[in-house]
UniProtKB/Swiss-Prot annotation:
May act as a double-stranded DNA (dsDNA) mimic. Probably regulates the activity of a dsDNA-binding protein. This is Putative double-stranded DNA mimic protein YciU. HAMAP family: Put_dsDNA_mimic. It comes from Escherichia fergusonii (strain ATCC 35469 / DSM 13698 / CCUG 18766 / IAM 14443 / JCM 21226 / LMG 7866 / NBRC 102419 / NCTC 12128 / CDC 0568-73). NCBIfam families: PRK05094.1. InterPro entries: dsDNA_mimic_put, Put_dsDNA_mimic_sf. Belongs to the putative dsDNA mimic protein family.
Amino acid sequence: MDMDLNNRLTEDETLEQAYDIFLELAADNLDPADVLLFNLQFEERGGAELFDPSEDWQEHVDFDLNPDFFAEVVIGLADSEDGEINDIFARILLCREKDHKLCHILWRE
């Protein structure tokens, strides 16, 4: 895969894209009670956080997860408005290079 450092999504664009994908697919992949909980609580406690891909993605994909081009977005709820997300609904792996649309999602079980 040829990738260009100058053709990447910004961190904000990456978060926005991951959240849009989450909203589009959540109803088909989460328990209805979880979807309801997330929708009711997101305004107060919800969030999306951007990370370098964790090593456990290697169990799910068979390519190099260079953090210059791949990001992991964690979407869920925190105990408080400024707290860390500890109730995870989805972990989304995205390629940030604009010409390589790639997404993998690990949903809450």
